[in-house]
């Protein structure tokens, strides 16, 4: 009888702690389920635009500074000092050169791709050269000064015909912050330029734009920074615009036809 009582006590004593452990287990299981049911990443609505494809390279403080090639084959992009390329439409990026010097433009001459070094609206002075469409780079070019001294690329305007071009239009800082009384920077715009003048495009993204380019299919490529033209608040500090470390490339899904 004593043995039977002892057995009953051994069974009954752990029951309440056991129920407590089970309750804790169910609680954490519920938390894990709720956490896993939430989306890990917020959806970037810019990637759902019907007219533009958006590509991003994270970890780039200065944004996209130069573009060459095309999205269907090989696209070469500079993010100020570094050169990246993609052959899978932006699904992955390979860094192919760390130039140590800012790259404002690319230019191609008879199979030689050149990285330029002058950050004027018209970039000049090639200093890096590639004979395999950007896969590898050298400081020694194939040609001489008689070729390289003539290289000029307008990084803010791309001409698709004799009478038609597309350009980046900086916007004046006309909006005044009520609290600090200073003008606020505004996002750049795009315009179509013909002999009839300039016409603003319906470009839906509020960004600082660094570069404009078109490929052989007359698709526009826009190099931009991740800067957002909105206030960010951290403690007692307010910052405008809000910087992010992302290089962005916008590509028109349809060609722009020359008229």
Model feature map: region roles:
Residues 32-259:
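Extracellular glycan-interacting surfaces
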Residues 27-30:
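C-terminal motif of bacterial Sec signal peptides marking the signal peptidase cleavage site
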Residues 2-19:
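Bacterial N-terminal signal peptides that target proteins for export
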């Amino acid at each position: 009888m004593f043995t039977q009582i002892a057995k009953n006590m051994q069974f009954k004593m752990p029951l309440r702690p056991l129920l407590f452990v089970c309750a804790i287990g169910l609680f954490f299981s519920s938390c894990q389920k709720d956490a896993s049911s939430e989306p890990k990443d917020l959806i970037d609505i810019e990637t759902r635009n019907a007219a533009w494809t958006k590509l991003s390279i994270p970890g780039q403080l200065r944004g996209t500074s130069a573009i060459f090639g095309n999205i269907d084959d090989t696209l070469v992009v500079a993010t100020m000092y570094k050169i990246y390329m993609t052959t899978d439409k932006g699904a992955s990026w390979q860094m192919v050169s760390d130039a140590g010097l800012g790259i404002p433009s690319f230019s191609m001459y008879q199979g030689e791709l050149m990285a330029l070094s002058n950050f004027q609206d018209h970039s000049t002075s090639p200093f890096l050269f590639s004979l395999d469409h950007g896969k590898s780079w050298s400081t020694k070019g194939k040609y001489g000064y008689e070729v390289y001294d003539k290289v000029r690329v307008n990084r803010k305007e791309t001409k698709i015909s004799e009478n038609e071009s597309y350009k980046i239009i900086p916007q004046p800082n006309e909006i005044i912050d009520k609290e600090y009384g200073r003008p606020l920077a505004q996002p750049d715009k795009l315009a179509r330029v013909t002999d009839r003048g300039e016409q603003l495009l319906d470009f839906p993204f509020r960004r600082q734009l660094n570069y404009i380019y078109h490929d052989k299919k007359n698709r526009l490529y826009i190099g931009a920074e991740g800067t957002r033209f909105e206030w960010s608040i951290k403690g007692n500090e307010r910052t405008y615009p809000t910087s992010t470390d992302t290089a962005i490339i916008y590509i028109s899904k349809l060609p722009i036809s020359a008229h």
